[in-house]
Curated annotation (Swiss-Prot):
Region (Disordered): 1-99, 234-268
Pfam families cross-referenced by the UniProt entry: GOLD_2
GOLD domain boundaries: 160-324
Native species: Mus musculus
Source lineage: Eukaryota, Metazoa, Chordata, Craniata, Vertebrata
Protein name: Protein TMED8
Amino acid sequence: MSDRQAAEGPAFWSPAARRGSAGGVGDRRGVEESQAAASEKEDLESTNVSSPLASASDPAAESSPYRPQMVSPASKDTTEDLQNVAGASEGQAPGEQAALPAGQTQVLSEMAKYQAPQRPEDTVMIQSEHTGAIDVLSADLESADLLGDHRKVSPPLMAPPCVWTFAKVKEFKSKLGKEKNSRLVVKRGEVVTIRVPTHPEGKRVCWEFATDDYDIGFGVYFDWTPVTSTDITVQVSDSSEDEEEEEDEEEEIEEPVPVGDVERGSRSSLRGRYGEVMPVYRRDSHRDVQAGSHDYPGEGIYLLKFDNSYSLLRNKTLYFHIYYTS
């Protein structure tokens, strides 16, 4: 082989090449067509083997059909997972957040309970059917009391009474037995209430009482109501519950209805006017004279209750003396 053949290589001086170069135009065209078919087949194989992720991210893969890219099965699975995540994120709303852990969700729900809603203040207009006056109430309906807050104000606390006893029961009963309106009989199952108004010239109320043979229940209460008369009156009821109902009905009739009041209050609101000076307890008034006094807390009526509702068999003879001092 000559030096020229060795330099140009065996492919240049092969018989097929020499035939192509020495042959006609038809032989050269056949060789070119066979090379083009081989290139198209190679392009098709490289397209099937390359991954979708590489073809989408690498622009050189589309411009270089002669560069095959091999992708392992694990890489193909990873690519599919990434595509699924991307599709889910695109379908999610712009302002929507990902699901939070269970613990954090519970904390946020607890914090939401303490966020007070902001809303405008409610306004209520009440027109009187009698006077035509219009009252405008601007307040929160959840906390406003349309039944009259002025009647539900707690009365002032009562000062404790001063109580004592003395043993001269016979002398006491003998003296009061001769006086008028100082002796009465409390029948079995009854409650007697002696109503004693405050006196303009007095500063405290005093009481003394005793009974024959058996004890009796006794308690003192105060009714914060205007005094129209200083006369002492006696009220008798079958039981303590019946007496309270009668007092409530009487107060509902006597008390004027304020303008703009949409409804009457319940009995509990009316009972808020009463202050307890001394609760009802059974007293050994058949052994010792029970006595006591209480300073006036203001204008009102004292209610001295003699309770025999617990006795089903015996009547109680009561001797009492009630007066005021200055």
